[in-house]
């Protein structure tokens, strides 16, 4: 099978694929997967079957393959389920027909999406979950469906900034290199009591973890838990025992919020209260939205 050219940059090509390559095998199943799901859109990409495969389709297929160690059967099943889920949730409706949901004051200040310059010089999208901003636990977490829609909305905004449909950078095969199309995630626990676990919070946390694991594979590069009391850091160490080594490597526990900037990246992209030199989270988010608006116009 010939090398695949990126539609947005003719000079960028995907490494040549053999007929028995996992990507080639998964691509050959696309007609059935798309037909059974009744849906073909995901993360800004419209999946299409062709030989050779389109560059953006390979980006999506590679993420699903890497998430299951190149098991083609498992990747095909997972992709089909995710496409059906996205159809049911109406996540890929055209912008002019998609109503922007207003989640109200219960979610104000709880989530942000920004961009930083990593220590290695590359850009990275960051999602911020500010649990200390919750005003009323029941109002925010009590309606599980509404909470999950809010959390998915935050994730979808972050993914949009990855520009998966137009990238010209391929994803290496499983165990052959780092996926460059991922984001960091910061969980801020300042002001949160670790001594009691509200049942609504527990249910929302469990449902969110399951939903994200099933429908958003290979999208996180690093996961920071900030403001965790030293006495509770053992809990996160224990969690490492129950997840894969690859997932555990992404966990970074930080007890003092001022130490976050040194771990995350360039100081100008991190607010001052977290050890950086940047603007507030809201201002950094608006800055990113403005940059993308100019780029897409």
UniProtKB/Swiss-Prot annotation:
GO cellular component, one term: cytosol
UniProt family annotation: Belongs to the SFH5 family.
Signal peptide: none
GO molecular function list: metal ion binding; phosphatidylinositol transfer activity
Physiological role: Non-classical phosphatidylinositol (PtdIns) transfer protein (PITP), which exhibits PtdIns-binding/transfer activity in the absence of detectable PtdCho-binding/transfer activity. Regulates PtdIns(4,5)P2 homeostasis at the plasma membrane. Heme-binding protein that may play a role in organic oxidant-induced stress responses.
Keywords carried by this UniProt record: Cytoplasm, Endoplasmic reticulum, Heme, Iron, Lipid transport, Membrane, Metal-binding, Microsome, Transport
Cysteines engaged in disulfide bonds, as pairs: none
Residues engaged in binding heme: 131, 151, 187, 189, 223
Pfam family, one: CRAL_TRIO
Membrane topology qualifier: Peripheral membrane protein
Subcellular location: Cytoplasm; Endoplasmic reticulum membrane; Microsome membrane
Protein name: Phosphatidylinositol transfer protein SFH5
Residues of the CRAL-TRIO domain: 106-282
Obligatory cofactor(s): heme b
Catalytic activity: a 1,2-diacyl-sn-glycero-3-phospho-(1D-myo-inositol)(in) = a 1,2-diacyl-sn-glycero-3-phospho-(1D-myo-inositol)(out)
Family annotation (InterPro entries): CRAL-TRIO_dom, CRAL-TRIO_dom_sf, CRAL/TRIO_N_dom_sf, Sfh5
